[in-house]
Amino acid sequence: MKVILRKNVASLGDAGEVVDVKNGYANNYLIPQGMAARATDGALKALETERKQQARKIEQQRVAARAIAEKIQQMTLKVPARAGESGKLFGTVTSVNIADALKVEGVDVDRRKITLDAPIRALGNYEAEVKLFMDVSATIKVTVEAEG
């Protein structure tokens, strides 16, 4: 019997896949547990429609991420921080500070998407990697300046 998996099943496959299983396994376990549904013509068409909608949605997100990446690539963020006379910071500039500075510039990015090569502990120019989508990332220039 052909079924459409609704959940990931370790021995069969991932959600959304159409697999062929024995009638008893489908009728007595997979379907009652909500792990699968019968692969009727209507269900297969609905699955195909859902996949197309999902692909469209992912493409829209990718286009939006590329637009944000272009905007970020051209920016130079200025992050103020308290520093001593030698240029050493009192504390560090982290991804949270960079995310806050981006938010001020009108770009809302989750701090966990920002990657620094090393913690920023001195005044100067640095670069940070911002992962915006599965295959879209941007490098942003960060200038750490003395406060006040």
Swiss-Prot record:
Keywords attached to this entry: Ribonucleoprotein, Ribosomal protein, RNA-binding, rRNA-binding
GO BP annotation list: translation
Gene Ontology CC entries for this record: ribonucleoprotein complex; ribosome
PROSITE patterns, alphabetized: RIBOSOMAL_L9
GO molecular function, one term: rRNA binding
Pfam families documented for this protein: Ribosomal_L9_C, Ribosomal_L9_N
Record-linked InterPro entries: Ribosomal_bL9, Ribosomal_bL9/RNase_H1_N, Ribosomal_bL9_bac/chp, Ribosomal_bL9_C, Ribosomal_bL9_C_sf, Ribosomal_bL9_N, Ribosomal_bL9_N_sf
Statement: the UniProt record of this protein carries the keyword Iron: no
Function: Binds to the 23S rRNA.
Family of this protein: Belongs to the bacterial ribosomal protein bL9 family.
PANTHER family in UniProt: 50S RIBOSOMAL PROTEIN L9 (PTHR21368)
Protein name: Large ribosomal subunit protein bL9
The organism of origin for this protein: Prosthecochloris aestuarii (strain DSM 271 / SK 413)
Gene: rplI
